[in-house]
Amino acid sequence: MLRKGDRKMKQLKVAMLGYGIAGRAFAEILDQTHAEIMKTRGVDVRVVAITTGSRGSLYCMDSLNLTEATRQMTESGKFDKSSPTFSSMSSMDVVKTVDYDVVLELTPLNIFTGLPATDHIREALKRGKHVVSANKGPLAWHYKELRDLAKANNACFFFETTVMAGTPVFNMADNCLQFCKIDKIEGILNATTNYILKEMSKDISLEDIMRAGREGGFMEADASMDTEGWDAAAKLTVLMNAIMDADITPDLIDRTGINGITTDDINDAKARGNVIKLMCRGERHADGTVTGKVAPEEVPESDVFADERLVAVVSLYTDLMGKLTMMQYGLETTQTGYGVFIDTIRVIDTIIRD
């Protein structure tokens, strides 16, 4: 086990809750970089548990073979019950009983409550375990509680992947903007609606775009969380809570989705030299109150937010560094996995430094 202040070769045991796209991408990156981590950090990172909701779990107190885990999941969509490392443990069983140092919260999102992922994180932090979350739900609904619990138990709590995959928004705010005051955030945070609005500019109806997206496998069967603005509202909430210390929840965001947008609206905006984007805006006002809004807006074609190549973009308004903008031009599974991976490295670096 790696403990704070240790600089000798040690093990960092990782428990993974969920093994979907982000989990498998993390596993691949970890396999590729394992030797380099040992060389540069003196730490042997070992995954000892992987859980899923209905596809079985794996556990080995020494270390799991991640290549084999991915093979099983890719070939059959579940873990092999005949495997010596197969387990019936649930995510909460692992969180409460297994010997690990870091838990990766990668379970499916519940955008309306943040559960059960919040319970997983809460129990891990109570045990003094470090947490890396790719799940935005707990941060959107219970950020302050979990942040304070992490501090009380001297545990790391990182969540880079929750908003813009591996794009280092929180890392920049935490480490590169120290002593800066951030009172305003704006951006485009939902890739699905960004894609839909771009396709509608080609005179394709929303219904046809959704149908093609579902048939192509790159859009959820139920994309209402995207089109109604819930996903964007949750991401804006996470940004405002973590960067602006806002202490709000998604239901407090003034939210309007894109379901009411028509191709006529798109064309009318174009005639005015504008494009329509689902914009996210969060602000702290002079009286200390905070407000957040998600809604379709007309954006000038010359604006950075109008760039059709963008998947997502966020601007932070600071008192000392002015306006800083981070742009994401592609959305690959590697980026999502990298966000989880680099948060795990941050855990190691924090422990070694302290």
Where does each model-flagged region fall?
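Substrate-binding/catalytic subdomain of NAD(P)-dependent oxidoreductase enzymes
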Residues: 199, 210-305, 313
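Short, ordered loop/turn segments at secondary-structure junctions
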Residues: 55, 136-137, 162-164, 329
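Conserved active-site and cofactor/substrate-binding residues in soluble primary-metabolism enzymes
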Residues: 21, 25, 45, 64, ...
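A short hydrophobic/small-residue beta-strand
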Residues: 131-132
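Rossmann-like NAD(P)H-binding beta-loop-alpha module
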Residues: 151-219, 230, 238
